């Protein structure tokens, strides 16, 4: 496993412009907090996924307050699915692995290929590519990811989804919220017919991150490492919802109807009493 999440060789392969400009790449890494990401990964890559994720919050001096976590304690052995909003883009994925992974070590999360660069968490990830429709090779990655996800659940293991497939964005009502949950993800849930647990992450990234997303999603993506390390001494609030049975979901016959239902169930957890 590579010690770095992203290094100079990775960058020059992705962008030939940087060939022979290692000093410039290092300056960019420092500006974007990629150097901090690489340092954390190199020091902790030996840890299993839940411990690797938990230690990140410890090093940030952040606390995680989980409401209704007893739901996870009462889940019987066997497969289930979690669905969550996606306000952070990185820390919510790590928090999910921390929270659910400490209850079930076989828990995996479906993520974008970008997060799959975190080598220490690859055993906990099933990667797909958000731009799969643009490239046959990327489509193959996504097809494999979907196949792996379905096999994982059918073999009796739990799986986490961020059904929006992208980080939450600013709405016309000036709220930061997920886009419509993607029918492709909801179809998987419909086919698997296992219990679903909604998990809501309170809060969001900085307004700089949000504004960059309105310009170009790639600019927002470059900002992700900074958005991890600017969360020092924060309280992260997470609300776990009650289990939704396959029978309850069966009354919603289309992916759009079920997606709207599951999203509403998740956002109903937003109020923190």
Tell me the role of every PLM-derived stretch.
Residues 85, 131-140, 171-176:
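Flexible, glycine/proline-enriched loop segments at strand-loop-helix junctions
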Residues 2-9, 142-273:
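Non-catalytic C-terminal accessory region of glycerolipid acyltransferases
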Residues 107-142, 146-147:
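Conserved nucleotide-cofactor-binding alpha/beta core module
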Residues 81-83, 127, 160-162:
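Structural motif
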Residues 1-86, 93-95, 102-106, 122:
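Membrane-anchoring hydrophobic helices of lipid-metabolizing enzymes
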Residues 86-90, 167-168:
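Gly/Ser/Thr-rich loops at beta-strand to alpha-helix junctions
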Residues 98-101, 177-179:
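Glycine-rich, phosphate-binding/catalytic loops in enzymes
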Residues 91-98, 184-187:
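Short amphipathic alpha-helical face segments that pack within enzyme cores
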């Amino acid at each position: 496993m590579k010690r770095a999440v992203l290094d100079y060789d990775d960058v020059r392969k992705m962008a030939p412009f940087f060939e022979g400009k290692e000093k410039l790449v290092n300056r960019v890494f420092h500006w974007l907090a990629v150097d901090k990401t690489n340092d954390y990964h190199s020091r902790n890559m030996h840890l299993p996924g839940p411990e690797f994720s938990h230690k990140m919050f410890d090093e940030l001096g952040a606390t995680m307050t989980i409401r209704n976590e007893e739901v996870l304690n009462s889940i019987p052995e066997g497969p289930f699915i979690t669905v969550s909003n996606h306000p952070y883009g990185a820390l919510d994925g790590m928090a999910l692995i921390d929270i659910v992974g400490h209850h079930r070590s076989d828990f995996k999360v479906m993520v974008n290929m970008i997060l799959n660069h975190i080598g220490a968490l690859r055993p906990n990830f099933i990667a797909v590519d958000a731009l799969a429709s643009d490239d046959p090779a990327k489509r193959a990655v996504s097809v494999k990811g979907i196949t792996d996800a379905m096999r994982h659940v059918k073999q009796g293991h739990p799986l986490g989804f961020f059904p929006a497939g992208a980080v939450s964005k600013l709405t016309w009502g000036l709220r930061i919220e997920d886009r419509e949950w993607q029918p492709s993800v909801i179809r998987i849930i419909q086919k698997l017919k296992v219990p679903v647990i909604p998990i809501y992450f309170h809060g969001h990234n900085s307004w700089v991150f949000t504004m960059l997303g309105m310009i170009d999603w790639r600019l927002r993506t470059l900002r992700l490492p900074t958005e991890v390390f600017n969360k020092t001494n924060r309280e992260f609030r997470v609300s776990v919802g009650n289990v939704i049975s396959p029978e309850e979901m069966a009354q919603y016959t289309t992916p759009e109807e079920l997606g709207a239902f599951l999203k509403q169930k998740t956002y109903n957890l937003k109020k923190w009493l």
